From Swiss-Prot:
Catalytic activity: a cytidine in 18S rRNA + acetyl-CoA + ATP + H2O = an N(4)-acetylcytidine in 18S rRNA + ADP + phosphate + CoA + H(+); a cytidine in tRNA + acetyl-CoA + ATP + H2O = an N(4)-acetylcytidine in tRNA + ADP + phosphate + CoA + H(+); a cytidine in mRNA + acetyl-CoA + ATP + H2O = an N(4)-acetylcytidine in mRNA + ADP + phosphate + CoA + H(+)
Protein known as: RNA cytidine acetyltransferase
List of residues that carry N6-acetyllysine: 426
Gene name linked to the record: Nat10
Residue ranges annotated for the N-acetyltransferase domain, each copy included: 558-753
Region described as Required for localization to the nucleolus and midbody: spans on this chain: 702-1024
Residues binding ATP: 287-296, 470
Annotated stretches, region: Disordered: 990-1024
Modified residues (Phosphoserine): 934, 984, 987
Residues binding acetyl-CoA: 629-631, 636-642, 725
Known EC number: 2.3.1.-
Species this protein is from: Mus musculus (Mouse)
Length: 1024
């Protein structure tokens, strides 16, 4: 085995780190890097005075060697017994694996190691490493420990620039395939700036990028009590002053820093109050002793006689430190295991024998029990609930864990977990408001709801830890990690330029190549941008930084105040807009996806909308999704976000034509270094020089052609109002709430102006109608928890033109309601029956109203909210009393008025239908005549006279002798007087004698008949 002298600077760096309690970072380039881990660990073991440092070994899938420790130990013991162990010849790596406490961990299971501490961390499979994983693992290493990153053999570190990372496959979409590895480039360049970082090859030769260690010198040995800081002296004084106050004194004695001691005192103050209504929130960066402070506080709660103590965290594995300090507290309080308490460990192999229960039976039965964050229902008898790593628990679960008991919570706020800001921004903000409300006296506005709110109000105490315990202050690796991942941008700079008018501000395009080049000026600008991101958004993880730098479809814009021409410094940033270009998916891909139910990564809006509406054409449109609009916290709500959005829309509508003749071409691929050009040991890595300007005006860059702008966000009333005001229309609302925030994802779209604008807007109007119909149906299911105000805000949208719907007809009415139903409604409208009698009809009425099928029926906002709450969300009047904030009597009055209006409308519909069925009366159209009345009468008289003459002429030609009535008046008078009143027949003597010829008989009979008839007529006249 060839032996080689190790560079002395490596040993000095490790020993200095141990002496200063600061971590060191080693990047080992080469396939045999794992063999050098043994040497580095050996140096660390010699430098530290305590036991062999434990190791955390993280990998993707394949470890590359057997991790079976027992098997290796048996083999080793056999060799020792047989005397065949040769330390010079045997593989030192085998010995290292057998004799060291190594925790092997897949990258996708690193959440289980939160809260644990290791002496050394090894990260292999660099391509699987993400910023989140880097932050999570590096922060578990204690002061004096080592972080070792293993890279494969390469000729140049610049090969890492073009290395394909596993996460890149998620950034590629059908339309955007070319990923540029800006994050890796910045990562490598940042290594040169870290004073405690060494980049070495697998022969332990130091590479030129780490030239800063050329002058490293060993630190002189220091006495332990030398140079105590003022904080350490204050801590000693505090411990001495509390010696006589027990059990507080012994617990504070276990604290390492002044911050931690003050936190423990605050916890014990909450315990001793025993109001069970206060929340103590402890926030700090990693490695500040949060879990230890909680553990000591739990020991204090047991000493104060608390019986039911529950502890929760994402996994029992995260509670190693907490329980370790519970037992340290017990030792200080002179509790003895088995005599005073017993420990129950988990048998679940996933939890790695974690402590899940402690039974204390010194004075009376007391328990400390681990529960899963989702099991808040089991907290019925709790007196104290402790939430560790609250930042890693979804926000809705943390809210459900708060109740009528004392709550201690600890949270990491550096944003490494992704939800750290969520907890500090949202939850603690809400607790602050509740706490403030409890101080205010009740008003007479609505005493019932105010009293209920005050009953649940809690007092909030906030504690933060600044001083690090896991490693000494000023740790170089912590500073490097914070700068690399922009974790430490919580302190946002105040803008000194005043409030410019939003109309005067301009939007600029940010060149990402320049932004992530690790130049000093661009680093300052990047930190400013990320500070805005962190301060104005609920969820911000380091992975977002990698997506921003590497994803090909993402673009950055920033809103800047008017910049005077003489200004040399970088301007203040008012707002940042991140846009992701989506769409342009081939129809075939969408059809395949719809038929198989599979979606590719990326293209969030096209895939979701295509699936929701089963529309294969939508994915072909090109759109821009606004990923974030982050506005400076001092300027929120002043119109800067709306201005940025307005300018962005104008840019993509082509209203800023590109005036540049030669557009700045950014090289798509990075120049690779040939292996002959320079060796790894001679290569000098520096930031690139030939970079385009950081900021471009919108008319200096041609815009991509887009059909629509879209946004997907967690639905809140404020955000909905903002996007509606910007002209966006909701088309999708996810039915299940987001695990992290408890909010429902909402997708809203807006078409961009084009020549055929009417046709453009038609598909959006169709989507909106379909969405509204579905949303109304789902209001009684997943969306029943929404407040009526929020639901109304979603349904009412003026950004889509109202289409004229057919009025409600009698057939439709009869299909929905029986005559008896209408009778019931009428009876209620007259206050003759109770409202329970018509509750079954309200859903149908609500649906008709909100689908605009009730014609001109108009309701006030309160009436609409009431109708929606009762009819579509199926809420009780008591619930609505709290949500609408009106007394129930007033609500019932409003409800009766709604039904009256509806009954009147239904009656009108029926009356109209009956009118249409009745016989139609002919309408006489009165028009002025052409002739005067006298002319008209003269003409009619002439016509009559002519007609009369013709008829008289006809009569003259006919023989009328047979119709002549014989006799004169005297004869008739005589005959009639003789006959009397009741006579039916009278006879008059004729002058002619009757002819007796047989031939004339028929004629005679006819004549007689006629005569008889004539006589009858005469008789009738007489009667009259």
């Amino acid at each position: 085995m060839n032996r080689k002298k190790v560079d002395n600077r490596i040993r000095i760096l490790i020993e200095n780190g141990v002496a200063e309690r600061q971590r060191s970072l080693f990047v080992v380039v080469g396939d045999r890097g794992k063999d050098q881990v043994v040497i580095l660990h050996h140096m660390l073991s010699k430098a530290t005075v305590k036991a062999r440092p434990s190791v955390l070994w993280c990998y993707k899938k394949e470890l590359g060697f057997s991790s079976h420790r027992k098997k290796r130990m048996r083999q080793l013991q056999k060799k020792i017994k047989s005397g065949t162990l040769n330390l010079k010849q045997d593989d030192p790596f085998e010995l290292f694996v057998a004799a060291t406490n190594i925790r092997y961990c897949y990258y996708n299971e690193t959440h289980k190691i939160l809260g644990n501490t290791f002496g050394m961390c090894v990260l292999q499979d660099f391509e699987a490493l993400t910023p989140n994983l880097l932050a999570r693992t590096v922060e578990t290493v204690e002061g004096g420990g080592l972080v070792v990153i293993l890279l494969r053999t390469m000729n140049s570190l610049k090969q890492l620039y073009t290395m394909t990372m596993d996460v890149h496959s998620r950034y590629r979409t059908e339309a955007h395939q070319d990923v540029v590895g800006r994050f890796n480039e910045r990562f490598i360049l940042s290594l040169a700036s870290c004073k405690k970082c060494l980049v070495i090859d697998d022969q332990l030769d130091i590479l030129p990028i780490s030239s800063h260690v050329a002058s490293i010198e060993a630190l002189p040995p220091q006495a332990p009590d030398e140079n105590l800081s003022p904080a350490a002296l204050e801590l000693l004084e505090l411990k001495e002053s509390l010696q006589d106050t027990q059990p507080v004194g012994v617990l504070v004695d276990c604290c390492k820093t002044l911050d931690q001691a003050k936190a423990v005192l605050k916890f014990i103050e909450g315990i001793s109050e025993k109001t069970l209504r206060s929340t103590v929130a402890l926030t700090a960066a990693r490695g500040r002793g949060k879990s230890a402070a909680l553990g000591l506080a739990i020991a204090g709660a047991v000493a104060f006689g608390y019986s039911n103590i529950f502890v929760t965290s994402p996994s029992p594995d995260n509670l190693h430190t907490l329980f370790e300090f519970v037992f340290k507290g017990f030792d200080a309080l002179q509790y003895q295991e088995h005599l005073d308490y017993e420990i129950v460990q988990s048998l679940n192999p996933e939890f790695n024998k974690a402590v899940i229960r402690v039974n204390v039976f010194r004075e009376h039965r007391q328990t400390i029990q681990y529960i899963h964050p989702a099991d808040a229902v089991k907290l019925g008898q709790a007196e104290l609930v402790v939430i560790d790593e609250a930042a890693a628990i979804p926000l809705p679960l943390v809210k459900s864990l708060l109740g009528p008991y004392l709550v201690f919570m600890a949270s990491t706020i550096n944003g490494y977990e992704g939800t750290g800001r969520s907890l500090s921004l949202k939850l603690i903000q809400q607790l602050r408001q509740q706490s403030a409300q409890s101080q205010v006296s009740t008003t007479a506005e609505n005493k019932t709801t105010t009293t209920a709110r005050l009953a649940s109000a809690r007092t909030l105490h906030e504690v933060s830890l600044q001083e690090s315990i896991r490693y000494a202050p000023g740790d170089a690796v912590e500073k490097w990690l914070n700068d690399l991942l922009c974790l430490d941008c919580l302190n946002i700079t105040r803008i000194v330029s005043g409030c410019p008018l939003p109309e005067a501000c301009e939007l600029y395009y940010v060149n990402r190549d320049t932004l992530f080049c690790y130049h000093k000026a661009s680093e300052v600008f990047l930190q400013r941008l990320m500070a805005l991101y962190v301060a104005s958004h609920y969820k911000n993880s380091p992975n977002d930084l990698q997506m921003l730098s590497d994803a090909p479809a993402h673009h950055l814009f920033c809103l800047l105040p008017p910049v005077p021409p003489t200004q040399n410094a970088l301007p203040e940033v008012l707002a940042v807009v991140q846009v992701c270009l989506e769409g342009e998916i081939s129809r075939q891909s969408i059809l395949n996806s719809l038929s198989r139910g599979k979606k590719a990564s990326g293209d969030l809006i096209p895939w979701t909308v295509s699936e929701q509406f089963q529309d294969p054409d939508f994915g072909g449109l090109s759109g821009g999704r606004v990923v974030r609009i982050a506005v400076h916290p001092d300027y929120q709500g002043m119109g800067y976000g709306s201005r940025a959005l307005q300018l962005l829309q104008m840019y993509y509508e082509g209203k800023f034509p590109c005036l540049e003749e030669k557009v700045l071409e950014t090289p798509q691929e990075i120049r690779t270094v040939s292996s002959e050009a320079v060796s790894l040991l001679e290569e000098v890595i520096t930031p690139r020089k030939d970079l385009p300007p950081l900021l471009l005006k919108l008319n200096e860059r041609p815009a991509e052609r887009l059909d629509y702008l879209g946004v997907s966000y967690g639905l809140t009333p404020r955000l909905l109002k903002f996007w509606k005001r910007a002209g966006f229309v909701p088309v999708y609302l996810r039915q299940t709430p987001n695990d992290l925030t408890g909010e429902h994802s909402c997708i809203m779209l807006k078409t961009l102006a084009d020549e055929d604008e009417a046709e453009q807007g038609a598909w959006l109007a169709a989507f909106w109608k379909d969405f509204r119909r579905r949303f109304l149906a789902l209001l009684s299911y997943q969306f029943s928890t929404f407040s009526p105000a929020l639901s109304l805000n979603i349904i009412q949208n003026r950004n889509v033109a109202k289409s004229a719907l057919p009025a409600l007809g009698r057939e439709h009415l009869e299909a929905l309601f029986l005559p008896y139903d209408l009778k019931r409604l009428e009876m209620y409208s007259r206050n003759m029956v109770d409202y329970h009698l018509i509750m079954d009809l309200i859903p149908a009425i609500s649906r008709l109203y909100f689908l605009n099928q009730l014609g001109d029926l108009s309701l006030s906002a309160a009436q609409s909210a009431l109708l929606l709450g009762i009819g579509l969300q199926h809420k009780s009047v008591d619930q609505l009393e709290k949500e609408i904030e009106l007394p129930s009597g007033q609500l019932m009055g409003l409800f009766n008025r709604i039904i009256r209006k509806v009954v009147k409308l239904f009656n009108d519909v029926q009356e109209k239908a009956i009118e249409e069925q009745m016989v139609a009366v002919k309408d006489v159209v009165m028009e002025p005549t052409m002739k005067t009345l006298s002319d008209d009468l003269d003409e009619a008289a002439k016509e009559f006279q002519e007609k009369h003459k013709k008829e008289v002429g006809k009569l003259k030609d006919m023989d009328l002798s047979q119709y002549v009535i014989r006799g004169d008046d005297e004869e008739w008078n005589e005959v009639l007087s003789k006959a009397g009143q009741n006579a039916s027949i009278v006879s008059l003597k004729s002058d002619k004698k009757r002819k007796l010829e047989t031939k004339q008989e028929p004629k005679q009979s006819k004549k007689l008949k006629k005569r008889d008839n004539n006589r009858k007529d005469m008789k009738l006249k007489r009667k009259k």
